[in-house]
């Protein structure tokens, strides 16, 4: 068979096998893993297909989704879980009816909600001068997000309002003036001061129209300094308390005792709102475990006291330990209390960082001269009445 005859046969039967078919490739924006409500766009690219006009066929799994589309793209304006699946495409060139190879399958996954998670490194309890980085991550997705950072404060006009399930206002969000809105999900504070004490959270967004994630978890930062402008005074003066007891928290400023408010963040991730206030003193008449958390004083201008960790225990034994850091070289006394009465009828073990430090029959122990190495988590244990929660005991350097 001569070449002319072969070419004639090929023309008659429109054979395309003499040239290699171009390959179709599917791309998905903003990401292969998206969330319900986002706008998703699929695009079919013909590699090596030139700029000639193509018609596109789209397939989901094993059936035809859109048979003949002139445009390369199609979109879900508000994606739902049903749209999850494997997608492929193929092109048909209208000038000569040549088809591309079908693309490799690309899987689109649609999840119910976009959740952000804040973590902190190295620690959330810091000393003035330290540096700390808060990281914001969108669960199961890392592409195309921009992030904004906020502090959580009592709501006032002009702030973003966060409401509960019943429509009640929980708190307000105040955008940080130096909030990073770039693609990086981290927020770094260098040379922190006590005024950085507070509760932080992040939001992420992407796409057009803009899609917002849910608010992140709340992340407290607690910073202690040597000379804060005000002190949080706790009465009774200890960090652990029994349920059903009463407690007062007051802000004591040597120059001005007004203009300060007690703030708090409890362990069930809620801002503390004092229901009984007298001047700068907050009175709690009936403690519950929900009061466990971090507390500090704050002025309208943003000045803060050192934060204090308060633990409310529903057991029978607590540890009486100092509220504020003890000066190095001074003595430290710890007591084991049984429903507000010092245990003295039998042996009590005192622990530091889960190792027995002393065993005492008096219900109290003393370190005559403390140093930085004595810092740690302390608790006490009675053989019959139980053990206390742990409390962090810190020390500060003496300056003459």
Where would I find each of the regions flagged by the language model?
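Extracellular/luminal immunoglobulin-like beta-sandwich modules
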Residues: 88-112, 199-225, 294-314, 379-399
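Solvent-exposed loop/turn motifs of extracellular immunoglobulin-like beta-sandwich domains
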Residues: 2-8, 35-39, 69, 79-90, ...
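Short beta-strand segments within Ig-like beta-sandwich modules, predominantly Fibronectin type-III
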Residues: 63-71, 175-184, 272-279, 354-363
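Short beta-strand segments of immunoglobulin-like
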Residues: 29-34, 121-126, 236-241, 321-326
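N-terminal Sec-dependent signal peptide, specifically the hydrophobic helical h-region
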Residues: 1-27, 111-118, 220-235, 245, ...
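Solvent-exposed loop segments of extracellular immunoglobulin-like
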Residues: 46-62, 138-153, 255-264, 338-354
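A short beta-strand segment in extracellular, disulfide-stabilized domains
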Residues: 33, 38-46, 131-138, 246-252, ...
